[in-house]
Amino acid sequence: MNKYEVIVVGAGHAGCEAALAAARMGCRTLVLSICLDTVAHMPCSPSVGGVGKGHLVREIDALGGRMALITDRTAIQFRLLNTKKGPAVWGTRTQNDKARYRISMKHCLESEPNLDLKQAHVESLAVEGNRIVGVIDQLGVFFGADAVVLATGTFLRGLVHIGTTSVEAGRAGELASYPLANQLQRLGFTLGRMKTGTPARLGRRSIDFSRFREQHGDEAPKPFSLFTDSIALPQVSCFIGKTHQRTHELVRRHIHLSPLYNGTIRGVSARYCPSLEDKVMRFPDKDFHQIILEPEGLDTEEVYASGTGNSLPYDIQLRLIHSVPGLEEAEVMRPAYAIEYDFVQPTQLKATLGSKLVEGLYMAGQINGTSGYEEAAGQGLWAGINAALKAQGRPPFILDRSEAYLAVMVDDLVTRGTNEPYRIFTSRAEYRLLLREDNADLRLLEKGCELGLHSADAAKELRERRGAIRNELERLRLTHVRPSAQVNQTLAENHSPPLDAPAPLDKLLKRPELNYSTVAILSPPPEPLSSKVTEQVEVECKYEGYLKRQEAEVAKFRQLEQAAIPEDLMYDDIPGLSNELRQKLGAVRPLSLGQATRIPGMTPAAVSVLMVHLRRRAQGGPFLAPVLDPGVNMHSQKKKLA
């Protein structure tokens, strides 16, 4: 039977999360992949997470996705980054066994009762009127669906470049998809062109590791997932080295052979993951660039040479690698390459990641102009949830920017669009003190439960933990410690000033040199508390003032977010708006005044005009007084229209 409620095209990180979400929400779901041997493949770095990206992984886990759990099962190194800064920008990063990750995720898909996994090369979408009804593969087989998620990665008109050699491919050795890209254009979608790449893979036995600095993982690794009880695999090291002036000279001398610099590649490169050619040419004064050797797994000789990505001819690549101290004898098992591919300008999508042009069509991952496994997985989960809700006739699932990094990413894409590969950063979030890795479950797990992506037991555990956090914060506030020789000795051992008067425990915990463990020595809780509780208590206590200030900012932000704009609003009928802004508003079709303020080029005056129009339109309905501040970050006069 070829009729499904949700079909997902592509089985990369976006496709896997989309399919699992839809299936677990009760939809009969089909995943179609060009090759079932590369489900959840990691075509570039053998790692997950990092600053910002780790936040996404935790949020995926909290909502009910599977990336965090599979990452923990297959991780061979854990590191918590940015620990010298505040907890808002801490980021977990893992090295992963690529083969085990792929196998584990595929097993997860195959074990899901509502989910079918098939190998097929989708060539076209079946559209009736302006509504999706299914897909058709290369063999002419039709698969019907109420909703379709496109998670095509780099396969739309993919073109791999190594020197003067260019090959049509979605990844090295895999078929590209040209008919589907052509059809998207015929349907009216605006496509752009982007470029990414991957470095060489080296043979482990051919590397002189003594010339590199060993980088160990954390001694007490903390998993990504709430549901991971222990770390399963042996932990290994990475190794840090650097390029040599010989390396840079080789790049400069042969730059005319790089497709990136001779005009062959027209796609826009990733700003935050530059190739070696870009680093050498853009930063000529730098004496060296960092190289990190990352193991690709426990059972393979392949080592990922991070920092050596380029698109130069193979013979030049060999010379580049051999110019690096410690890699003089290195065997190149796979050459570096660049890849160009098509993407759909994401302003053509709604906040659900559903298309504005074709009802029931959703898009997730690199097709939306993003880069990174984590960004793809997050969009896949978001799109899969909404595709399932669409198929079931239920209201859509949308978060706002104050609730999750996932929402920041989606809002950036659908409101502002992108002309270069988009990557998440903590700096993109206005309310990052509230959107920490450590509280992702407190923010989002209940929503995952409501969607049917978590069990009742998970919801019960969350309620109990939330209660324990609340009770301990209250105990710290009400319990006073009196000065004594023992108390002051404990404080002195932690380089903290002595007490000369009774002090509440929460005030002591606010001292930067003290942590919860020390305060608990002075006055232990009635019952032992889990680390999940005590870590949250410490953060909420130490940063209480900052958190309250940001919560007040969120309250202002939500005033604008709650001022809805009708989807059918005719912007051409609003006097006082420039033609440029009418076009932008008509293209994005913001759902709220808040979203309208974030459209590039939107001015405070234009927002005021829009507010006046909405207020007049709503005469007889609710008055829009709460939204007289035309934007949290636009510094306009709040009483201008009073």
Swiss-Prot record:
At which positions is FAD bound? 10-15, 122, 177, 366
UniProt-annotated binding residues for NAD(+): 269-283
Pfam families per record: GIDA, GIDA_C_1st, SAM_GIDA_C
Q: What is the lineage of its organism?
A: Bacteria, Pseudomonadati, Thermodesulfobacteriota, Syntrophobacteria, Syntrophobacterales
Q: What family is reported?
A: Belongs to the MnmG family.
The cofactors named for this UniProt entry are: FAD
MF terms from GO for this chain are:
flavin adenine dinucleotide binding
Quaternary arrangement and interactors, per the entry? Homodimer. Heterotetramer of two MnmE and two MnmG subunits.
Write down the SMART domains for this protein, in alphabetical order: GIDA_assoc_3
The function of this protein is: NAD-binding protein involved in the addition of a carboxymethylaminomethyl (cmnm) group at the wobble position (U34) of certain tRNAs, forming tRNA-cmnm(5)s(2)U34.
Name of the protein in question? tRNA uridine 5-carboxymethylaminomethyl modification enzyme MnmG
**NCBIfam families linked to this entry:** mnmG_gidA
User: According to its UniProt record, where is this protein located?
Assistant: Cytoplasm
Q: Which Gene Ontology terms of cellular component type are present?
A: cytosol
Q: Which UniProt keywords apply?
A: Cytoplasm, FAD, Flavoprotein, NAD, tRNA processing
GO BP term, pick one: tRNA wobble uridine modification
